[in-house]
Amino acid sequence: MKFRYSLPCLLLLVVMLTGCGHNFDSSGYVTSIMDTLYKGNYTSYMDFTGVSRSDVSLYRDQWLTSSAEAFMTAFGAGTPSEETTDRIIALLNQLYANASYEVTAETPASDGSPQTVQLSIRPLNILKDNYDAIQVYVHSFNEKNAYFSYADLTEEAYYDTYLDGILTILESHLADMTFGEATTLDIPLEKNSDGLYTISEDTLTAIQNTLLPWPETDTQQ
């Protein structure tokens, strides 16, 4: 498969990623969204929208769960135990805490084009840097599986065992994680029929794939 991060439909899109008002601070608003999703810092977003801390926290928890599910899918894994899912979420939280991004420019709406913010992102290279080690592990796992080494495991335990090897590799390299060259994305802010500014799901996925890029490979579990 092509290792590619593709977020499923996010429950938080309609409520969370909206803003309105005159003299809209698009740079601050986009930064507040990034801070909420990646840093767990809700203060600015709450100031923009008036959404309660408990609601924003719930939306972020849902987003992290979706992120964990996308992680499993990217590595060809089915549903593991709750403990392994929590471990994936904990890893993602540690990765996202290191996210580096900033708004570098704004382009006002004109001639039918939406208002746009330029967002500079430095990619987290942990997946690319450790791809070879992960590939060796997956190959070894598949060889053992071919000889029925995991035949006595339940499906849940099977995926726990498979994901444990990948998570162990990534967790052991959190301290020496490197960053890629900054990449700038255009983030359109479009008004919906209610006059609310929104960021599309495709744009959120593009941000995610830029911040945490996957190596392109045809190898899977």
Tell where the protein language model's regions lie, with residue ranges.
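Bacterial N-terminal signal peptides that target proteins for export
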Residues: 1-7
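Aromatic (Trp/Tyr) and acidic
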Residues: 9-13
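C-terminal motif of bacterial Sec signal peptides marking the signal peptidase cleavage site
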Residues: 16-19
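Core segments of small alpha/beta cavity-forming domains
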Residues: 21-101
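Primarily extracytoplasmic ectodomains and periplasmic/lumenal surface modules that are beta-strand-rich
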Residues: 41-44, 124-125, 195-197
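Surface-exposed, charged secondary-structure patches
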Residues: 76-163
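Short beta-strand edge/turn micro-motifs at domain boundaries
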Residues: 138-152, 157, 161, 175-221
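Exoplasmic/lumenal beta-rich domain surfaces
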Residues: 165-168
